[in-house]
Curated annotation (Swiss-Prot), chains A, B:
GO MF entries: 2-amino-5-formylamino-6-(5-phosphoribosylamino)pyrimidin-4(3H)-one formate-lyase activity; ferrous iron binding; hydrolase activity, acting on carbon-nitrogen (but not peptide) bonds, in linear amides; protein homodimerization activity
Source species of the chain: Methanocaldococcus jannaschii (strain ATCC 43067 / DSM 2661 / JAL-1 / JCM 10045 / NBRC 100440) (Methanococcus jannaschii)
Gene of this entry: arfB
Keyword check for Hydrolase: yes
InterPro entries: Creatininase-like_sf, Creatininase/forma_Hydrolase, FAPy_deformylase
Similarity comment text for this entry: Belongs to the creatininase superfamily. FAPy deformylase family.
Name of the featured protein: 2-amino-5-formylamino-6-ribosylaminopyrimidin-4(3H)-one 5'-monophosphate deformylase
Role played: Catalyzes the hydrolysis of the formamide of 2-amino-5-formylamino-6-ribosylamino-4(3H)-pyrimidinone 5'-monophosphate (FAPy) to form 2,5-diamino-6-ribosylamino-4(3H)-pyrimidinone 5'-phosphate (APy).
């Protein structure tokens, strides 16, 4: 069966060898404004949009996610479980002709699996790259991107509630003491959020989202050069 | 870890028990205007959008697809392979609290797996439903929906090319002799396409897409009543 690789809105015939996978987290508190599956919803949105714009294959999502021990704001898995799920998707993706895999990751803790990517490349004789699109947790950037995608409940009252760091310590990780003690970058971000609070900035959300999609599209173009 | 189930744009706390899965096909000719992964791209778009609008979990896509023996316009798998992939996704979905699975299917041939849904329900003690959103193959409806989503190359010249049923027998299945002989419904549709041709109707595409998303959203609401 000869497939029509140049049909439709596709960059070129080679793009059919590229598979995009969304990675985030499903069970993670994000204050009042954002849902617990914020990270995977943002990752899925960006991954699918970039696939539509280029013709690359959208292979779905990785369900498990992982996190640093000292960050306690959700339910996560061991890095090995994320790795094992990736193995499954790559194995299935190879069956439909994918040779280059691009993982769009929108949850900071998943950076812990980057060390596995070389093993995947070696085992399956493929190319795997990961793009990390992450934000200060549940803060102005993520709230604004979430709003543009449609997952945020960002009325004035809920936003006010969201800024109650006592009640929602995960927001900006302001109230995650152990995380702040163990990670300087987290502590620095928390200080900024505590001082300036979390706002909804629709223009910012749009800009960040478009830049993120553009970044993935550029990476896909690079992968088929 | 207490998860904030009512946070964000979610119908209610129960919606977190609903998982949406996209099912289509990745390797199937769709004339000149549409790409070979049209069905899974449309299914993914509808499934993700409905998940965003309701708060249901988007669990990704099923990579294998199946087809009737007599329809030869792509590369497909046995129904059992689709079933086995669904088993994997359901097993993983249960781990994050999903109890009700909704499969958004945009490839007619996958109706062959409907007989497996009861087995899945029995094996995993869960609820599985499938919504079929299918069109006359690569014809006006699908071209128009594909255009709205962004996967179509629908300039005048390509559309003209698309209507060359000699060169693209799969369009409307006009030139798929075996399929038309074996299936009256396919034959009937092929006659209509042969007579009226394939056009781009942006308004129609928008209307069909919105209705499809609405249909999935209503089914999700029903599943959490």
């Amino acid at each position: 069966m000869q497939l029509r690789l140049s049909s439709g809105n596709v960059l070129n015939e080679k793009v059919h060898k590229v598979g995009i996978i969304a990675l985030g987290s499903f069970l993670e508190n994000h204050g009042a404004v954002l849902p617990i599956d914020t990270d995977i919803k943002i990752a899925s949105y960006i991954a699918l949009k970039a696939s539509i714009l280029t013709g690359a294959k959208f292979l779905g999502v990785v369900i498990p996610s992982t996190e640093y021990e000292y960050v306690k704001h959700g339910i996560h898995n061991k890095p090995e479980e994320v790795y094992s799920y990736m193995r499954f998707l790559i194995n299935e993706g190879k069956k439909i002709g994918v040779e280059k895999f691009l993982i769009v990751n929108c949850h900071g803790g998943n950076i812990l699996v980057e060390s596995f990517l070389k093993d995947l490349e070696y085992e399956f004789d493929i190319k795997v790259e990961m793009i990390n699109i992450t934000f200060t947790h549940a803060s102005t950037e993520e709230v604004s991107v979430g709003y543009i995608i449609g997952i945020a409940k960002a009325d004035e009252e809920t936003l006010k509630e969201h800024n109650n760091f006592e009640k929602y310590p995960e927001v900006g990780m302001v109230g995650l003491k152990e995380a702040r003690e163990n990670n300087k970058a987290i502590d620095k971000e928390a200080k900024v959020v505590k001082r300036f609070g979390v706002k909804l900035d629709k223009k910012l959300g749009e800009k960040i989202l478009n830049n993120a999609i553009e970044k993935v599209v550029e990476k896909i173009k690079e992968m088929i050069r």
